[in-house]
């Protein structure tokens, strides 16, 4: 998905305006492919929005059949259910990026300023605390 999304961002000349808006403080929550789009580095060298001090590894959790649910601690929230669908993970964090959640030693959520990324899909559970965390970040409460 991130490859197609990145291609469309380029073809539709959206990369530069979106990068500019992010640089100007636009809050962004990148889920799964969005994590890859926001990363400054990726395992395959493809960089799109170049916004977060993270390195993303795409399709790290395998194919669709490798999708799974697990519980993990999310910083500032506590234990939550995390749903992974052919998910990436974060292999490196530097600069201002902060790790928020890890599963089996792999980083699956991070933030930097008003940017939040998750390798998992919080919208596939009934728990809205991760979305609430993003809203708190926007308001400056977190």
Predicted stretch roles:
Residues 24-25, 52, 113:
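Structured helix-beta-strand junction loops
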Residues 31, 85, 126:
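A conserved hydrophobic position in a structured secondary element of the catalytic/binding core
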Residues 89-142:
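C-terminal and late-domain segments of enzyme folds
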Residues 42-106:
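Pocket-forming structural segment of enzyme catalytic cores
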Residues 1-30, 36-42:
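Flexible gly/pro-rich beta->alpha loop and the following alpha-helix that scaffold active-site loops
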């Amino acid at each position: 998905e991130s490859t197609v999304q990145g291609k469309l961002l380029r073809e539709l000349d959206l990369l530069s305006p979106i990068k500019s808006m992010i640089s100007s403080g636009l809050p962004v929550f990148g889920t799964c492919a969005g994590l890859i789009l926001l990363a400054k580095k990726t395992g395959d060298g493809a960089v799109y929005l170049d916004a977060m001090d993270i390195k993303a590894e795409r399709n790290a959790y395998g194919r669709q059949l490798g999708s799974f649910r697990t519980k993990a601690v999310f910083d500032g929230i506590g234990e939550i259910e995390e749903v992974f669908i052919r998910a990436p993970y974060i292999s490196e964090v530097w600069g201002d990026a902060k790790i928020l959640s890890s599963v089996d030693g792999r980083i699956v959520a991070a933030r930097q300023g008003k940017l939040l990324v998750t390798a998992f899909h919080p919208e596939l559970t009934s728990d809205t605390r991760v979305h609430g965390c993003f809203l708190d970040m926007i308001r400056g409460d977190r």
